[in-house]
Amino acid sequence: MNALQEDTPPGPSTVFRPPTSSRPLETPHCEIRIGIAGITITLSLCGCANARAPTLRSATADSSESTGFKNAPDLRTDQPKPPSKKRSCDPSEYRVSELKENLITTTPSRPRTARRCIRL
């Protein structure tokens, strides 16, 4: 058996050589360009399929200082938190709210303890 066979997938003892022809390859290819800090890396992939993958932010290699398109939403900004409900330190107000809660709930619950308010 010849160790160098054409059109044979690689196996444990064979070396794969792709078929050669006189006409240029007609398979589709695509390029992927990655720009990081002024360095551009171009990957050329032969025989790949085109797939669209939308991204939220992108920057070109020519203007790496750019943060992306003007219309792209910026998801890095923190959303403002809703205002928290202020608790009263007055024990009489706490007792009234506790009685209201007891009227609403019908299931028995453990007794509540008063919370201390610490002001800095």
Swiss-Prot record:
Subcellular localization(s) per the UniProt record: Host nucleus
Domain of life: Viruses
Gene Ontology biological process terms from the UniProt entry: symbiont-mediated activation of host apoptosis; symbiont-mediated perturbation of host exit from mitosis
Keyword Ribonucleoprotein: no
Disulphides: none
Region (Disordered): 1-27, 56-120
CC terms in the record's Gene Ontology section: host cell nucleus
UniProt feature, compositional bias: Basic and acidic residues: 87-101
Cited InterPro entries: CAV_VP3
Any single Pfam family the record assigns to this protein: CAV_VP3
Entry similarity comment: Belongs to the gyrovirus apoptin family.
Stated name of the protein: Apoptin
Organism: Chicken anemia virus (isolate USA 26p4) (CAV)
